[in-house]
């Protein structure tokens, strides 16, 4: 398969690219800072058209993982970057797919499980999950990002491409630089322990 990974130079994208490449797939990672890799890497700015549109045309699947890291302080500038980077990159991918002569069959779009309200009485899923009301919970900004991010995907004019939102939470991997690495460092410094009620 021909697989394109916008924003695929982060931890999750690297894990996917490594696995797809090992299985013999044709992998292209789109990155703001492309570096050496066993697969093809192309530069993109996450916002506008460019040479990268050519690899989207004829791809079997696009997996968009682009977005500024949320591992930061949530001051106004970072909040704006978190929101803008997700919406702009989603729109850019949608424009590339819409312009393709042979659009991909599937567009997998990163999303976030923080769209759901915190609850202990039932599980949240796509069918019955309770969406957190904006401003009602502690995670109002995260919910706003999630809703606007998904709206950008839904509004993309790509009728020949099936669109799927991946409402994922933190992805744990033993690789350096990921959330597991950060949490493990805290535990090693004696700062581990139960998070919240421990019943999450």
What are these regions (language model features)?
Residues 25-32:
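Conserved glycine-rich Rossmann-like NAD(P)H-binding loop of the short-chain dehydrogenase/reductase
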Residues 35-92:
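NAD(P)H-binding glycine-rich loop region in Rossmannoid oxidoreductase-like domains
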Residues 3-23:
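N-terminal Rossmann NAD(P)H-binding glycine-rich loop of SDR-like oxidoreductase domains
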Residues 6, 30, 62-66, 107-113, ...:
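SDR active-site strand-loop-helix element
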Residues 91-137:
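Conserved Rossmann-fold NAD(P)-dependent oxidoreductase catalytic core, especially the SDR/UDP-sugar
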Residues 121, 156-157, 162-200:
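NAD(P)-dependent short-chain dehydrogenase/reductase
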Residues 134-163:
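Active-site Tyr-X1-5-Lys
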Residues 15, 19, 96, 152:
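Rossmann-fold NAD(P)-dependent oxidoreductase module
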